[in-house]
Structure formats: structure tokens, C-alpha cells
A protein has these predicted regions:
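Domain-level signal for soluble alpha/beta catalytic cores
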Residues: 1-372
């Protein structure tokens, strides 16, 4: 088993553009023109090809590209008992576009009566490891699941099952423990919790999304930090748990904007992760000063290369920004990656596979120049 630990000096978030043959296989399956066995065969082939390409580029971490998912987060929730979903009529609002992902809601107590599908997904990638690579498993954070079922659009429905948030939180913590323990038994030692809640908290209208005031939002921050920390505390001690803080990433659009200043004390100071993958690809993310709040010896992966546009960043400008960030956190605790995945949902961002690989080549070139 590989003993490598994430993050690496040049790294990536996790999702990749779906190849055309996978999109076609998914379309045929959804339309009843093929069965699951045929779909899985194509998924397997595409994942093997993806991992081979990642290795060819010289990266030390591998994922399945999230090729078996419709979205980065909802598929994970669909794997639990007590969670239902139906095709949406309105979608989720992004800037300039709505993400037409399934409405997902509580239909009973959240539980896990059988192995979560993501565990078998991980086993497939684990088998593709070699001495130079390690598989990581991405999943939405516990806070993301809590937000999904407690934000105003779902609150009344959730209250039909749960009398208070503590009951819901306890059930979420319990199912995460089962999933993480099963992943550990399958050989997983690197997990990434993807989390859009902090991006919403940082947005100037974030409080309205939670039906509270700017001051009241601090209590929500603490609740989300607490549930993440409870899950982290339950994990095996040698399980590396990182987090990716996102502002939404659908078809090259975004859901929230705002600097990290308003969430830094709680997120950077009190969340007990090993490393933060942070978006810093444009002015929506603000400056680097909040990084001074990153406590202990936690690491920061700077997401300075955008996945929302095919245009390649200026290498020297990125290098300069890395050194700017090192004014607030030592260079030896900094790393580099794209700002997000390339396809948080099946539709993917507006660039080609070739442009996607060019982005990863650039990340590696810059990281090698900065850190050697």
C-alpha cells in the first residue's frame, strides 16, 4: 500500500472533464438504451485511461475523476438511507446560469444499512496505485450535507423527520464514521472534504441564504466547523483529511464570491484538517492576508490556476502570487493546484481535455520552479 500523503507541491482537486464516450454511455443508460453493466464497463475504461494520463504528467495523486457521479456532492448523499431525489424544475442559481441538478431532500432518518457506493469506487482506483502515486477519495464535507438539509429551501421538509438539528447532526456524524471506516479498511489514507458552505458564508448576501443576519452567520460557521471536526475526530489517526473550500463551479460559472476575511477565524483557526485547498484564481477570492489565521502547522494549497477558462495563466505572475502568499504563511507550508475541479458536475467547464491537461502541466512547471 502506498504511504504517500497529500497534498503534494503540485496537486489537483479531483474532478476531470468526462470523455465523449463516457457522456454517450451515460446518455444511453439514462434513456434506457443500455444497462448498468455496459455503463460501468465504459466508466472503468475511462478511469483507467484518466489515471494513466495523470501518471504520465508526473502527478503523485490519482482519483477516478468523479466519472461515476452526476455531481460532486449529491451522489454521495444519495448513497444514504433516508435521502430522496427527483429531477429539478428550478435548479440551483449560479451567476448567469442555473445548475439543473436533482432536488435532494430528507425522506427519513439518515442512515447506512449497506456499504456506501463510494467505497467500491475507491477500491477500483486503489488498485491503480503504484510506488509513485496514491489514491485520494473526494466527498462533500459533513457541513455540506448539513447545509443541504437545513437551509431554508429544505428546512420545513427536514423538520418532518428531525425535531432539532442535533439529531440530524448526530446521524450525519454516524454515517460519515461508517463510510470513513470502510474506506480505511479498503486501504484509503487520504480523504478530501469538499465544502461550499464557507464560500456562501463569505458572500455579502450569505446571511440571506441561511435566513439570518451577518452577525447570526457566525453561529452557523461554528456549527459547520463543529460537525466537520466531529467527523475528523472519529477518523483513524493516520487518515489524512484535507478540505477544498469552493465558491461553486458549474459550467464555468460560480455561486458565491467574497474574501476569506469573514470566515478565517473559524475556518482557518479552528477546523482540524491537515490542509486547505483554497480558490485564489480571481478577485472574488480577495487577498492572502487571511492566511495568517491558519493555525498550527496546517498546509495551504493555493488554487491559482483557474479551471473556468482555457486561457493559460502567466507563469511569472503566478510565481509572484505564491511569494505574496508566503508573507502570511511560510513557503514550505504552501502548495499549488488548479482552483477547483474541471467538472464538478457531468456537464464540465468550458474548456477542452487538451486545455485541461495544459493547465495541469503549467501547475507542475510552476511548482517545480518554486519548490524544486
Amino acid at each position: 500500500m502506498s504511504n504517500l500523503q497529500t497534498p503534494f507541491r503540485y496537486d489537483f482537486v479531483g474532478s476531470f472533464l468526462r470523455p465523449d464516450k463516457l457522456k454517450e454511455a451515460r446518455r444511453m443508460f439514462d434513456n434506457g438504451e443500455s444497462d448498468y453493466t455496459a455503463l460501468k464497463k465504459v466508466e472503468d475504461e475511462c478511469i483507467v485511461e484518466l489515471v494513466a494520463k495523470i501518471k504520465e504528467l508526473g502527478y503523485n495523486v490519482i482519483t477516478d475523476g468523479e466519472f461515476r457521479r452526476a455531481t460532486w456532492h449529491l451522489d454521495f448523499m444519495w448513497g444514504f438511507d433516508g435521502v430522496g431525489h427527483t429531477p429539478t424544475e428550478t435548479g440551483l442559481p449560479f451567476h448567469g446560469e442555473a445548475a439543473m441538478v436533482d432536488d435532494t431532500y430528507i425522506v427519513g432518518r439518515i442512515g447506512l444499512s449497506k456499504e456506501h457506493p463510494f467505497v467500491e469506487h475507491f477500491r477500483f482506483v486503489k488498485a491503480l496505485e503504484d510506488e509513485n502515486t496514491v489514491a485520494k477519495q473526494t466527498m462533500p464535507s459533513p457541513a455540506q450535507v448539513l447545509a443541504q438539509f437545513t437551509m431554508p429551501f429544505n428546512r420545513l421538509n427536514t423538520e418532518k423527520v428531525y425535531s432539532d438539528d442535533k439529531e440530524l447532526e448526530d446521524d450525519i456524524v454516524a454515517v460519515y464514521k461508517k463510510v470513513i471506516d470502510d474506506l480505511y479498511a479498503a486501504g484509503c489514507r487520504n480523504i478530501q472534504l469538499d465544502d461550499c458552505t464557507w464560500g456562501m458564508f463569505a458572500d455579502k448576501i450569505g446571511h440571506t441564504l441561511y435566513g439570518t443576519t451577518r452577525e447570526g452567520l457566525i453561529e452557523f460557521q461554528k456549527a459547520h466547523k463543529d460537525i466537520n471536526n466531529r467527523v475528523i475526530a472519529n477518523a483513524p489517526k493516520d487518515m489524512i483529511i484535507n478540505t477544498h473550500v469552493c465558491r461553486g463551479n458549474f459550467h464555468s460559472t460560480y455561486a458565491s464570491e467574497g474574501a476569506y476575511d469573514s470566515v478565517a477565524d473559524v475556518l482557518f483557526g479552528e477546523e482540524n484538517v491537515n490542509a486547505y485547498f483554497l480558490e485564489f484564481d480571481d478577485e472574488r477570492s480577495g487577498g492572502f492576508a487571511p492566511l495568517a489565521k491558519v493555525s498550527g502547522d496546517k498546509k495551504v494549497v493555493l488554487g491559482l490556476i483557474t479551471t473556468k477558462s482555457p486561457k493559460l495563466e502567466d507563469k511569472q505572475l503566478v510565481i509572484d502570487r505564491i511569494h505574496d502568499a508566503s508573507k502570511y504563511i511560510p513557503l514550505d507550508r504552501l502548495y499549488l493546484s488548479p482552483q477547483c475541479g474541471f467538472a464538478s458536475c457531468e456537464i464540465g467547464n468550458k474548456l477542452t481535455e487538451e486545455e485541461q491537461w495544459a493547465k495541469l502541466k503549467l501547475v507542475k512547471e510552476i511548482a517545480t520552479e518554486v519548490w524544486g
